[in-house]
Amino acid sequence: MASHAAVVEIIDDDDDDDDDVAAASTPPALHKRSHAVAAAAPDSPDAFSPSPPDPKRRQLAASTIVLDDTPTPPKRRPPPVAADRSASVVADTPRSFVPCSLRNRAIAGDTPDSVLPSPSFHLDAPDSATPGSDVPCSVGLDDIVPETPGFNSPRLARPPAVPGLTSPMTARKFSGVSCPISLDSDDELDDTVYRESLTRTPSNMAKPEHAIQPCTTSCTDKVENTKSTDKKDYSKSNVGYQTNNSACKNNGTTSYNQPPRANSPCEDSTLKEADPFINNHCPQEENALPIEERKKKQQEEKRLKKEKKAREIEEKKQKRLETKKQKEAMKAELAELKKLEKEKKKWESGKLATKCIVAEIDSSVIESGSVGGHLVQGFHEKGLCFRVTSNSIKGSILWKMQIPNEFTQDQASTSQVPYILFVLQAEEFCDLVSGGTLLDHVQKVRRQYPEFTICYVTNKLMSFIKRREQNQYNKTTSNSNSWKRPPVEEALCKLATHYARVRSRHCTDEAEVTEHIVGLTYSLANCKFRKPLTWLSVHANGSNISKGCVDKDRIKKSAWLKSLVAIPGVSPGQAIAIEKKYPSMRSLLNVYMDDSKSVHEKEHLLEDLRLEGPLGDFKRRLGPACSKKVYTILMAQNGAAEVEVDRRGA
């Protein structure tokens, strides 16, 4: 299908010019765009000769013609080059647009006589910058170099850009198009070359000028620039003007200014379809964020991290404080428990008993007589607690123990001591005895306090009786109202014989009364925690040893001697005689438990032991009575049995 387009007529020069160019052309792999019949052979020395000076050519006018843009099948001829050298060519179609991929390969300029530099031949000389010719350069991914017809440039003798492609068929196979489009006449089909894809091979990567640079500029701008060139008028005859050799650098890729070329709408659509960068935004533009926004985001992240770190530090601090408080609380609780345990032990041992007992004194005791002042002073001096109250029975004193709450285990916090004391003046006691109401008084107290011990304390009783008797004796005449001595001794004996747990105490003055009551308070406080006394505990410390004994200290140091002395009827001398024969209780018990001996022999076992006299003689014997006592006590089955020794034997 033919279409009208503004194109440039390409007029070939004489063959002489082509011959001149052929002399400086590259090896046969690079076909010159001319009507020359033959080129220099690969092995010819002219193939690598330096380029001749640029020929002077006149400018030719071009006119607008109508071209058929239907592609014509190109003529393919075998390349006159060895199989190991592949030709790197550039499409020779003037004013044509070859769609290519901007991502995968670069587009070289459609210059008729230009070739791409080859990495196989290293010519470090700078490229020719002759006016009117295209100087080969490294073409970037985004560069589209238009072709300037009518001008030939000396070709550089360099190998193909992509080694490994040995034929135009292979080059076309790896190119991005199915077939190059030629807008020239039929006789120029012989000079049609094929575009090879600039793939990334090790040979291409060797030279930096053949490296394909990535697209760093906006692809949309290039498409817009390409569209803007369509509006230019190419009908002018001065199309093939001479360009200045000004190198432009585009992201590391060097290209030379070429005349602008318009793209048709179909070419623009083809370019958009072939180029993915036009349809999609560049990744760098898509991922790029404004600097201020990134800074704000970074600052926000830093602030959040800082707040998180501060929050974690604060949480750790709070945890440490809570742990510290818990440890302090546990430590304080343990200290309190230890203190409580210590106080409990003190309480159980009776060390705190005097601080817990309270004496309840009837007000009549404090108000009447001279005992009250001394009694209050005595309690204050000893640090004892007392309380003046009005008791149910006049003149009585009661005691109570205030047990601490932490020591009580299902017990009342206050316990009453089962003891009641009556402080009676001598005249009061004599009136009770004379009137016969003393025993009635005892019965009354017993009914109210049945389990209590009753004690009567009198003050100056005997002195009062003597004074009254003396006064009665000094009277001259007998009076019917004369005072008679009350039977005090008989009343006190009845209290001791007829009633249990009834005591009496006669004091000579107020100081003795105070001392007795204070001492009784101490005893009542500690008696609850005191071990009960037994016969053995009373005599175990050697209290029954006579004062005139010479070996008293020796007996107190030996438990075996103190045990022997505690037996009734065993003197210290007899105990020492037994200890000399049998130094321990076990040695004596072994003999007593011997079954081979009879009971009679065991009873008389110790009777022949000799006692040491005052002068050191051993004339006296222990005797059968003492021997039987020792045997009876040590071999008794009942510990409460009394020792009653029969002199006649067992």
Curated annotation (Swiss-Prot):
Biased composition regions of type Acidic residues, renumbered to the chain: 10-21
Major location (coarse): nucleus
Known cofactor(s): Mg(2+); Ca(2+)
Location of the protein in the cell: Nucleus
Segments of skewed composition (Low complexity): 36-49, 82-92
EC number: 3.1.22.-
Lineage: superkingdom: Eukaryota
InterPro entries: EME1/EME2_C, ERCC4_domain, Mms4/EME1/EME2, XPF_nuclease_EME1_plant/arthr
Keywords: Calcium, Cell cycle, Cell division, Coiled coil, DNA damage, DNA recombination, DNA repair, Endonuclease, Hydrolase, Magnesium, Meiosis, Metal-binding, Mitosis, Nuclease, Nucleus
EC category name: hydrolase
Coiled coil: 291-355
Stretches assigned to the ERCC4 domain: 391-592
UniProt feature, compositional bias: Polar residues: 238-261
GO biological process: cell division; DNA recombination; DNA repair; meiotic cell cycle; response to gamma radiation; response to high light intensity; response to UV
Gene Ontology MF term list: DNA binding; endonuclease activity; metal ion binding
Disordered: annotated span: 1-94, 107-168, 220-326
Assembly notes: Forms a heterodimer with MUS81.
Family, per entry: Belongs to the EME1/MMS4 family.
Purpose: Interacts with MUS81 to form a DNA structure-specific endonuclease with substrate preference for branched DNA structures with a 5'-end at the branch nick. Typical substrates include 3'-flap structures, D-loops, replication forks, nicked Holliday junctions and also intact Holliday junctions with a reduced efficiency. May be required in mitosis for the processing of stalled or collapsed replication fork intermediates. Plays a role in DNA repair and in genotoxic stress-induced homologous recombination (HR) in somatic cells.
Protein name: Crossover junction endonuclease EME1
